From Swiss-Prot:
Name by which UniProt lists this protein: Flagellar secretion chaperone FliSB
CDD domains for this protein: FliS (cd16098)
Pfam family, one: FliS
UniProt xrefs under SUPFAM superfamilies: Flagellar export chaperone FliS
Amino acid sequence: MYAMKAMKQYQQVSIEAQVSDANPHRLIQLLMQGGLERLAQARGAMEREQIPEKGILIGKAIGIIGGLREALDSERGGELAGNLDRLYEYMIARLVEANTSNDTSLLDEVSALLLEVKSGWDGISH
């Protein structure tokens, strides 16, 4: 029990250190990674029929994707920013549906979309 608590504290400190040292490009990478992790955890909770936990994790994933939407710069990003905004909006709608229908395939769909966006973002060097 104590080992798990210590591990969680270590992970939290590690995440905080990464965030405090990160440039804006890296922060977006961390957000996307966090979103993918929450989606995987939500899938596990859904499979284990842990309904409250599933709802919390999907809510966190929605919050992260909402944060990614807010970070878009439509003036500098132009058409790409608009396309990403619509994609993020779609992802959020699918997550709401996944939460109400307990459909893991919807979580998988959003995970695949977010992973594709993250792969593109990771390909940009900063």
